[in-house]
C-alpha cells in the first residue's frame, strides 16, 4: 500500500490509524490524509458532478497520477482526501442547522427538470397507497392483540391509548395522497437534484464549512433528504421543524413536492414491540415523538 500511495499520489507514508472498518487516517511526511475504501464505482460520476457544479460544501478528493478519483488496491477500491480534525465540541443543534444550510445549497445548485410519463405518477401513487394499507393492517393487528389481553403492560396501555393518533396519521396520508394525485394529473416533469442521503454528525465539519462524506449522494427529489432525516428523529431531542427553517428560508418547495413530503411523513414507520418492556417503552415514546413532530411540520407546510 505504501508504494502504491507513493506512486499514485507522490506521498510518502509514515503510518496508518484505523478509524472505522473502511476509513484510515494516513500519516505522511506531507501531512495527514483520509483513505476510504468504497464499493460503488459510480462514485466517480458523483465527484464529477460535484466538481462540475463547483460545490464548495464537500471535502475535495485528491486525484491520482492518472487524474482518476478512485485507486485500486488488490481487490479493493479507495479514494484519498485531506484529513480534517473532528469538531465534536460544537453543539449538535448548530451542526444540524449548518447541515440543512448545506442541503439547501446542494439542492438549489443542482436542480434540473426531468420529463416523466403519466405512468410514472400512477406507479408512484399505487406504491405509496399499498404501503399505507400495509401499515394500517400492521398496526390494526397490534391493536387487536392488545385489546383481547386481560392484563396490559405499560407499553400495551401506551399503544391502546395512542392508537387513534396512528390511525389518524395513516388516514391523513391517504387523504394527502389523493390531493397529490389530483395535482400531478396534468404534470409531465419532476424537479430532481443531488441528494445527500447520509446524515451523520461526524460528517459535519463546521469550522471548515464542509461535509466529508459523499458516498451516498444520488439524483432524486429534494424532499427525500428531509424525509430521511425524519426517519432518524428519535435520535434528535430538540425542536426539529424550527431548525428546518434554515432550509426552507433558502429553498421553496413546489406544491407537488410539499404534498408528497407531507404524505410520506404521515406513513407511520414500523415499530417492533418485543419482550424487553423498557425498550418497548422507549420505542413507543419515540413513535409518539415522531407523530407530534410531523404534525408540527405538516401545519407549517400547509400554511406555506
Where are these regions (language model features)?
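ATP-binding pocket architecture of kinase catalytic cores
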Residues: 31-121
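Active-site acidic catalytic loop and adjacent metal/ATP-binding pocket
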Residues: 61, 174-226
Amino acid at each position: 500500500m505504501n508504494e502504491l500511495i507513493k506512486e499514485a499520489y507522490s506521498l510518502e507514508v509514515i503510518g496508518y490509524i484505523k478509524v472505522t472498518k473502511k476509513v484510515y487516517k494516513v500519516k505522511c511526511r506531507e501531512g495527514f490524509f483520509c483513505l476510504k475504501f468504497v464499493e460503488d464505482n459510480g462514485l466517480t460520476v458523483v465527484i464529477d458532478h460535484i466538481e462540475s457544479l463547483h460545490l464548495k460544501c464537500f471535502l475535495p478528493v485528491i486525484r491520482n497520477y492518472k487524474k482518476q478519483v478512485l485507486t485500486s488496491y488488490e481487490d479493493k477500491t479507495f479514494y484519498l482526501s485531506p484529513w480534517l480534525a473532528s469538531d465534536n465540541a460544537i453543539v449538535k443543534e448548530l451542526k444540524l442547522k449548518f447541515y440543512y444550510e448545506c442541503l439547501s445549497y446542494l439542492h438549489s445548485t443542482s436542480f434540473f427538470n426531468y420529463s416523466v410519463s403519466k405512468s410514472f405518477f400512477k406507479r408512484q401513487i399505487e406504491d405509496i397507497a399499498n404501503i399505507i394499507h400495509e401499515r394500517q393492517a400492521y398496526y390494526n393487528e397490534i391493536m387487536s392483540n392488545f385489546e383481547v389481553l386481560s392484563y396490559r403492560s405499560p407499553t400495551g396501555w401506551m399503544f391502546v391509548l395512542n392508537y387513534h393518533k396512528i390511525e389518524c396519521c395513516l388516514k391523513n396520508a391517504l387523504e394527502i395522497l389523493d390531493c397529490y394525485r389530483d395535482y400531478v394529473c396534468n404534470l409531465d416533469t419532476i424537479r430532481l437534484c443531488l441528494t445527500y442521503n447520509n446524515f451523520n454528525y461526524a460528517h459535519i465539519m463546521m469550522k471548515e464549512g464542509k461535509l466529508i462524506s459523499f458516498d451516498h449522494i444520488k439524483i432524486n427529489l429534494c424532499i427525500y433528504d428531509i424525509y430521511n432525516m425524519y426517519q432518524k428523529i428519535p435520535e434528535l431531542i430538540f425542536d426539529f421543524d424550527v431548525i428546518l427553517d434554515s432550509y426552507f428560508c433558502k429553498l421553496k418547495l413546489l406544491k407537488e413536492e410539499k404534498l408528497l413530503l407531507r404524505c410520506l411523513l404521515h406513513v407511520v414507520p414500523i415499530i417492533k414491540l418485543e419482550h424487553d418492556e423498557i425498550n418497548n417503552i422507549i420505542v413507543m415514546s419515540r413513535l409518539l415523538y415522531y407523530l407530534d413532530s410531523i404534525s408540527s411540520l405538516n401545519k407549517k407546510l400547509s400554511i406555506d
